């Protein structure tokens, strides 16, 4: 797979995760509602930024980003969430799994971009990996 193709898959994942985490944000229940509501807001805002950054990089490489939800659904590798009631522990377990998926995808992006001589995408992918690995560590500590 080429760099721009991986970027498109990641862009699809980012928009699906944006919606998925909104679902968690709106539908969490329990005594820790306020903390989880705030935490999930920060997370979905991060996915909005990621979606935009990926789209812009795709354009910079001379390709067209995803512009419809139907395109995103076809390309995503993330499982949508259709339930509408959640407890915080379940939310954070699901987000942790999604972060691990993204970590794998950004490693693939970094390696592929490196082979193609695309240093800018390598830097972007590695920056995302650093953020994801910190988030994974924090969620694992929270769930321990």
Swiss-Prot record:
Fe cation 2 binds at residue 56. PROSITE patterns: DPS_1, DPS_2. It is an enzyme of class 1 (oxidoreductase). It comes from the Bacteria. The keyword Iron applies. 12 di-nuclear ferroxidase centers are located at the interfaces between subunits related by 2-fold symmetry axes. This is DNA protection during starvation protein. The lineage of its organism: Bacteria, Pseudomonadati, Campylobacterota, Epsilonproteobacteria, Campylobacterales. The gene is dps.
